[in-house]
Swiss-Prot record:
One GO process term, biological-process aspect: apoptotic process
Subcellular location(s) per record: Nucleus; Endoplasmic reticulum
Name assigned to this protein: Ubiquitin carboxyl-terminal hydrolase 17-like protein 5
Biased composition (Polar residues): 493-505
Enzyme Commission no: 3.4.19.12
Biased composition (Basic and acidic residues): 382-392, 398-412
Protein task: Deubiquitinating enzyme that removes conjugated ubiquitin from specific proteins to regulate different cellular processes that may include cell proliferation, progression through the cell cycle, apoptosis, cell migration, and the cellular response to viral infection.
Catalytic activity: Thiol-dependent hydrolysis of ester, thioester, amide, peptide and isopeptide bonds formed by the C-terminal Gly of ubiquitin (a 76-residue protein attached to proteins as an intracellular targeting signal)
Gene Ontology molecular function terms on file: cysteine-type deubiquitinase activity
Domain USP: residue ranges: 80-375
Example of a GO cellular component annotation carried by this entry: nucleus
Length: 530
């Protein structure tokens, strides 16, 4: 790309340089580096946080927030049990947790997706919509999950429930993209699934020599917690957000003072998800042996202490589902779950058996995966059920919806009964396999450790550098079976307009506040690196 520049209101200059190598290939993230600035500088700390929010300009909103149903469509009572088809307890336990995730269930029951889906085969959102609808509308019954849900994953033996859970979430996220294949990574993070489960990490490195700050932002769908030295979820989160000193051989190569210097590194949550998936790392990556210890977890969890912006009031989440593993190794044992129905009653979902439980029993389990939802979200859904309010979805005109329904053919696969055809199972198997998915996950696993990147060349003083990274999956043309994968991570190249939007500080959703101070007389070079 040729270098070019743009002056905006006589204040900002945009220059394009070659992209630096990213530390994590799967995510669209950005890094900010700046020199220490005077207190009244237009790039003061408060303004810098606001700028951090603008690192992901959205070219296309794939699932506008107003499209999410306002009120609950879920039945108040608990739904059906799930038949074990042979070593599929991990599938059943994961599906029950997703089924009782209020925003996801409400969206599925609204049938918003199936009315506009143009994929006739292998759509995970359509498959999950059929499953959730059957499960919630058949209380007291036992249903058989569709084979398409685990096609390409299940190999006749027990697998890891968390891996299957994220396999399904990733597949649903990919299903949101068929009509938007050329969108950038930032726009992909506006999908329905990311709006429900997603947020952004912020890894901040502060040079102790020049006090320059480097911020790296990375999207997440779940949060892995190390429980080796933790007795509770809160302790594990504190360890995750604890500042790390970088010195000696691990010293930071500062891109501002252009030397190796001691630094402090802190990992925090920059934006919060509607639904938090917390996975307790109970299994050894080498042996698969289980850390069979009791880790306390609360019914209500305040995430504010772990956010990038402190002192903004409590950010309370409430527990609504727990996935449990009983056994001594990830290679054997049994999975089941506890879920909270709409009316507030807890139930134990053990394959076909559905039994009432208590919060005391729920909180005494050796949990593997915890599901929390923002308290305001849970109360809103519960209130709509108690009032018996007629549900509706925002952002869609009723007349347009009726017209869309009239245009759909009766044999549209997305509107068929939950039992899917064999060709759908075969197609899903061809599109994604467990081994391929695990291979991608190893490359793309969200980690709290972020590699420090070296900034080449000499930078002028008081310069602001934004590194825009992009990921190319590495799928070659001579591997069509890889190109067709449900979990293929497509590449995207930031456009010139996207770079402009970054500089103009277009607001990204988050919790940061916009600075009120602005020096209109100074000019600072803004280098957008691709």
């Amino acid at each position: 790309m040729e270098d070019d520049s743009l002056y905006l209101r006589g204040e900002w200059q945009f220059n394009h340089f070659s992209k630096l190598t990213s530390s994590r290939p799967d995510a669209a993230f950005a890094e900010i580096q700046r020199t220490s600035l005077p207190e009244k500088s237009p790039l003061s700390c408060e303004t810098r946080v606001d700028l951090c929010d603008d690192l992901a300009p959205v070219a296309r909103q794939l699932a506008p927030r107003e499209k999410l149903p306002l009120s609950s469509r879920r039945p108040a009572a608990v739904g059906a049990g799930l038949q074990n088809m042979g070593n599929t307890c991990y599938v059943n336990a994961s599906l029950q947790c997703l089924t009782y995730t209020p925003p996801l269930a409400n969206y599925m029951l609204s049938r918003e997706h199936s009315q506009t889906c143009h994929r006739h085969k292998g759509c995970m959102l359509c498959t999950m919509q059929a499953h959730i609808t059957r499960a919630l509308h058949n209380p007291g019954h036992v249903i058989q999950p569709s084979q398409a849900l685990a096609a390409g994953f299940h190999r006749g033996k027990q697998e890891d429930a968390h891996e299957f859970l994220m396999f399904t979430v990733d597949a649903m996220k990919k299903a949101c993209l068929p009509g938007h294949k050329q969108v950038d990574h930032h726009s992909k993070d506006t999908t329905l699934i990311h709006q429900i489960f997603g947020g952004y990490w912020r890894s901040q490195i502060k040079c102790l020599h020049c006090h320059g700050i480097s911020d790296t932002f990375d999207p997440y769908l779940d949060i892995a917690l190390d429980i080796q030295a933790a007795q509770s979820v809160q302790q594990a989160l504190e360890q995750l957000a604890k500042p790390e000193e970088l010195n000696g051989e691990n010293a930071y190569h500062c891109g501002v003072c252009l030397q190796r210097a001691p630094a402090s590194k802190t990992l925090t949550l920059h934006t919060s998800a509607k639904v938090l998936i917390l996975v307790l790392k109970r299994f050894s990556d080498v042996t698969g042996n289980k850390i069979a210890k009791n880790v306390q977890y609360p019914e209500c969890l305040d995430m504010q202490p772990y956010m990038s912006q402190p002192n903004t009031g409590p950010l309370v989440y409430v527990l609504y589902a727990v996935l449990v593993h009983a056994g001594w190794s990830c290679h054997n044992g049994h999975y089941f779950s506890y879920v909270k129905a709409q009316e507030g009653q807890w139930y134990k979902m053990d394959d076909a058996e559905v039994t009432a439980s208590s919060i005391t029993s729920v909180l005494s389990q050796q949990a593997y995966v915890l599901f929390y939802i923002q308290k305001s979200e849970w109360e809103r859904h519960s209130e709509s059920v108690s009032r018996g309010r007629e549900p509706r979805a925002l952002g869609a005109e009723d007349t347009d919806r009726r017209a869309t329904q009239g245009e759909l053919k009766r044999d549209h696969p997305c509107l068929q009964a939950p039992e899917l055809d064999e060709h759908l199972v075969e197609r899903a198997t061809q599109e994604s396999t467990l081994d391929h998915w695990k291979f991608l996950q190893e490359q793309n696993k969200t980690k709290p450790e972020f590699n420090v990147r070296k900034v080449e060349g000499t930078l002028p003083p008081d310069v602001l550098v934004i590194h825009q990274s992009k990921y190319k999956c590495g799928m070659k043309n001579h591997h069509p079976e890889q190109q067709s994968s449900l979990l293929n991570l497509s590449s995207s190249t930031p456009t010139h307009q996207e770079s402009m939007n970054t500089g103009t500080l277009a607001s990204l959703r988050g919790r940061a506040r916009r600075s009120k101070g602005k020096n209109k007389h100074s000019k600072r070079a803004l280098l957008v690196c691709q």
